[in-house]
Amino acid sequence: PFCIAQTLPHRPEPAVANGLRPGNRKINLHRTRLIRIFVRLYASYPKTIRMKRYNRWNNIVGWAVFAVAALTYLATMEPSASLWDCSEFIATSYKLEVGHPPGAPLFMMMARLATMLAPSTEYVPLMVNAMNSLASAFCILFMFWTVTHLGRRIYSAQGRELTDANMWTVLGAGAVGALAYTFTDTFWFSAYEGEVYALSSMFTALVVWLMLKWEEQADEPHSSRWIVLIAYLMGLSIGVHILNLLCIPALVFIYYFRKTERVTWKGIAWSTVISGALIVFVNNFIIPYTVWFGAQIDTLFVNTFGLPVNSGITLFALALIIGLGWAAWAAHKRGRVLLNIILLSTTMIL
């Protein structure tokens, strides 16, 4: 055996650097990386726990405020039809008829669903009023979440941690603001009767809250879905009242301040101009001329070409959907993100 060992090739010892062999250095490198990962997880663990606790209490207090508003409005709502337009809205909703111009088709359909829950015709006005009371309570809920979101963002912008004291300060501010609006005379007056302003206020509060949700997730890959959802809800709100269009300037300013690193007076001026142009585009072009153009095509197809009624408006709707869909797809394929969002938002509004 000694002779055989002498004939075997000699393996040189691996080079040693800093007192460590290559294998040991690799083990120490992995060990260092694992230690860093654990340190980061340990540092972020209290923050994650605090955010989960904040979100839990934010939901609990928010729904408690909603319950206070809902019970208040349901306890004080009009038992029957009240003065002004409420009687007309209740009657047209129950029979799905046409109300006074410019109309409120979405309100009529939602109120019709509410009247179907009435045990008899005597309770039809009560069900419409109850629907408005619940819509007003949801407006208060979204207002509470809006205030708490802004309060939490103020603390985070100042570099301060969300301690228990800060958390309850934010929740208290949201409760005070939401409940103060709950018992205001103007809002309470419209919350217990069958008018369109309660449902319109709910859409307004929902749209603003969703825009703040986008603001919090603006750097994530799929954050634009919030903007598309907002456009869809604004399109629905047109079927209740066009008052919701007044949210557009606020949404534009939130987008500008979130996406701009350096805020200037010129940028603020351009944001004002763009928001005004969007209001004019939706209110003076999309709302009236989309229906008018479809009616003109239908008249041409029926009176000139002798085609069946609604053939022109059907073809117009299909061409509009296909055209906007193809344009949005082409913008997506070419990487035109902003153009794609604009086209999708326009489609949702329509």
Label for each model-derived stretch:
Residues 63, 130-162, 203-210:
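Transmembrane-helix motifs of polytopic, lipid-linked glycan transferases
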Residues 222-225, 261-273, 305-314, 330-346:
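Membrane-interfacial entry segments at the cytosolic side of transmembrane helices
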Residues 74-75, 121-129, 156-170, 174-201, ...:
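Aromatic- and kink-enriched transmembrane "portal" helix at the membrane-lumen/periplasm boundary
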Residues 45-72, 138, 160-175, 316-349:
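Start-transfer (signal-anchor) and selected internal transmembrane alpha helices
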Residues 172-175, 210, 217-235, 264-277:
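Short hydrophobic alpha-helices at membrane interfaces in multi-pass membrane enzymes
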Residues 77-89, 99-111, 126:
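Extracytoplasmic catalytic/substrate-binding loops of multi-pass membrane glycan-assembly enzymes
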Residues 164-168, 207-227, 253-263, 325-327:
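Membrane-interface transmembrane helices that cradle and orient dolichyl/undecaprenyl
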Residues 55-83, 181-183, 241, 279-284, ...:
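Transmembrane signal-anchor helices characteristic of membrane glycosylation enzymes that use polyprenol
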